[in-house]
């Protein structure tokens, strides 16, 4: 059978494109080299807990179109991301808010906190040249040293003075007692896990797992008129211009015979000495209960370690510095010449996407491609 579209990858980008193409009457084949669907949003049920197998995924967006779209495929709970920072046994609120400033300096009013931050920000004059200067210009030296520096250096594997300033803009700062990390209108976790949501997207669509597209490219290409490729763009071209760099993450999962390990879904370890960046306790994404509302007797934690990516590792975060940006630009020129192939998603576009921006991107592409 000849398909209209071959979709490479069953993560959010691939699954949504496949769903939309099928809805427009197109025939679609989805292939994925993993033994499971859903890409990095894959969740697996263990001991009644939906475990986020490729790291914590908390859906949040201000885009009503995206929210209305994705909630067709899952009911979302009211989970709100309120991580805790652990610095050598001292616990702080994340995002940086009045609880954080009170613990750090003993200040009680927003006015006092603002004055303290302003006083410490003066250390940096002019445009921040790197992440360290940017962080100090946002929250001052004390919070930078205890809550930003060690965590960020573990996450990126390099000194904060060598990292670009824009990375730290992802850390909200507020002079209120609001513990909600994301300033988003819509937020939550799909009840029953992300895998179930992706299953709903792929309902009625042929999916072949354990199928490496690049190993069987010629025979798979022959099956379809057009390809939607969501894998790494440099791998598609055999790395012939060089390898794009990523940060990778590895997880050490542990099942514990206790009901509660840390009392929160995410605890960041912000000192340099603790080897992991954070511990995720998955059951709290769904309030410690199963789908029938029963308390879960056991808990599952994941210690998360950042690492330099090497061939064979899972690529997570593109290293969007100048060198990699230029190399991606050259691959993009090659990609633009590939008639009949659409490159999309985090790996296909070498771009940091949150889930909502991935969805917005693929919906825009569907409008262009499918009408």
What is the role of each PLM region?
Residues 12-13, 35-37, 99, 153, ...:
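Short, solvent-exposed loop/turn segments at secondary-structure junctions
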Residues 66-88, 143-146:
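A short alpha-helix-loop-beta-strand transition element characteristic
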Residues 314-371:
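C-terminal catalytic lobe of FAD-dependent flavoproteins
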Residues 85-92, 99-226, 230, 235-237:
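Active-site/ligand-binding neighborhood in enzyme catalytic cores
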Residues 24, 214-334:
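Mid-domain catalytic core of redox enzymes
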Residues 19-47:
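Glycine-rich FAD pyrophosphate-binding loop
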């Amino acid at each position: 059978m000849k398909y209209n579209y071959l979709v490479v990858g069953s993560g959010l980008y691939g699954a949504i494109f496949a769903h939309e193409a099928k809805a427009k009457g197109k025939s679609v084949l989805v292939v994925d080299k993993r033994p499971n669907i859903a890409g990095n949003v894959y969740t697996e049920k263990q001991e009644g807990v939906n475990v986020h197998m490729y790291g914590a995924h908390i859906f949040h967006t201000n885009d009503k179109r995206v929210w209305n779209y994705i909630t067709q495929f899952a009911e979302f709970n009211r989970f709100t991301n309120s991580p805790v920072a652990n610095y050598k046994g001292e616990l702080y609120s994340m995002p940086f808010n009045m609880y954080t400033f009170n613990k750090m300096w003993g200040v009680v009013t927003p006015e006092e906190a603002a004055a303290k931050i302003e006083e410490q920000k003066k250390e940096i004059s002019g445009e921040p040249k790197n992440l360290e200067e940017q962080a100090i210009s946002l929250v001052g030296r004390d919070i930078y040293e205890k809550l930003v520096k060690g965590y960020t250096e573990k996450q990126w594997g390099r000194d904060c003075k060598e990292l670009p300033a824009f990375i730290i803009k992802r850390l909200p700062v507020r002079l209120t007692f609001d513990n909600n990390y994301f300033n988003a209108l819509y937020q939550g976790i799909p009840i029953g896990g992300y895998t179930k949501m992706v299953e709903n997207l792929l309902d009625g669509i042929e999916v072949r797992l354990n199928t490496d597209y690049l190993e069987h490219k010629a025979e798979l290409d022959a099956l379809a008129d057009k390809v939607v490729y969501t894998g790494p763009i440099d791998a598609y071209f055999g790395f012939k211009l060089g390898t794009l760099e990523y940060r990778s993450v590895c997880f050490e999962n542990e099942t514990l015979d206790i009901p509660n390990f840390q009392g929160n879904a995410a605890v960041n370890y912000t000192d340099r000495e603790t080897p992991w960046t954070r511990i995720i306790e998955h059951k709290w994404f769904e309030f410690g209960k199963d789908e029938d509302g029963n308390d879960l007797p056991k808990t599952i934690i994941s210690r998360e370690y950042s690492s330099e990516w090497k061939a064979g590792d899972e690529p997570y975060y593109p290293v969007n510095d100048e060198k990699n940006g230029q190399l991606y630009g050259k691959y993009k020129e090659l990609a633009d010449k590939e008639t009949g192939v659409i490159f999309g998603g985090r790996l296909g576009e070498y771009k940091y996407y949150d889930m909502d921006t991935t969805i917005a991107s693929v919906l825009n592409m569907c409008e262009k491609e499918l009408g």
